[in-house]
Amino acid sequence: MATMHDKITLQLPAKPEYVSLGRLSLSGIASRAGFSYEAIEDLKIAVSEAITNSVKHAFKGEEDGEITVEYLIYEDKLEVRVSDNGTSFDLETRKQEIGPYDVGEDAEMMRIGGLGLFLIETLMDDVKLYYDEGVSVVMTKYINEKQVEENAKSIST
């Protein structure tokens, strides 16, 4: 198991104007951790989607909501937890309501709803959802995933 080096916590009001603050802080943290430009862009999109989902769905425009964003930096990965204490939902029920997405489907013809979680799952290496008091989305991205694959190929037995 990888050792955690640092944990950074950010408390955001559940308002659209603060989504960019989560994205900007992530960019600096991921850059310092050694992620490539492409991986940082993927991380920024995924975290923006997770925070936006909390703003739009957990609090439904209420002024007093708060979102917690935790960045856990390990030697080989970055784990980002976006948590709220707003209205929860059941992912499996939601997936059944909207049906599966076809990656070959024309983007203009895609139905609205559920695309944020689809994007998060596509861009991140691992995604877990927890339903306690609200929803927590835990997203993991490994550092130098291509390098890890190359090293595995070069190991001889």
From Swiss-Prot:
Keywords: ATP-binding, Kinase, Nucleotide-binding, Serine/threonine-protein kinase, Transferase. It is an enzyme of class 2 (transferase). It catalyses: L-seryl-[protein] + ATP = O-phospho-L-seryl-[protein] + ADP + H(+); L-threonyl-[protein] + ATP = O-phospho-L-threonyl-[protein] + ADP + H(+). It comes from the Bacteria. Its EC number is 2.7.11.1. One of its GO terms (molecular function) is sigma factor antagonist activity. One of its GO terms (biological process) is negative regulation of DNA-templated transcription. CDD domains: HATPase_RsbW-like. Negative regulator of sigma-B activity. Phosphorylates and inactivates its specific antagonist protein, RsbV. Upon phosphorylation of RsbV, RsbW is released and binds to sigma-B, thereby blocking its ability to form an RNA polymerase holoenzyme (E-sigma-B). Belongs to the anti-sigma-factor family. PANTHER family: ANTI-SIGMA-F FACTOR RSBW-RELATED, SERINE-PROTEIN KINASE RSBW. This is Serine-protein kinase RsbW.
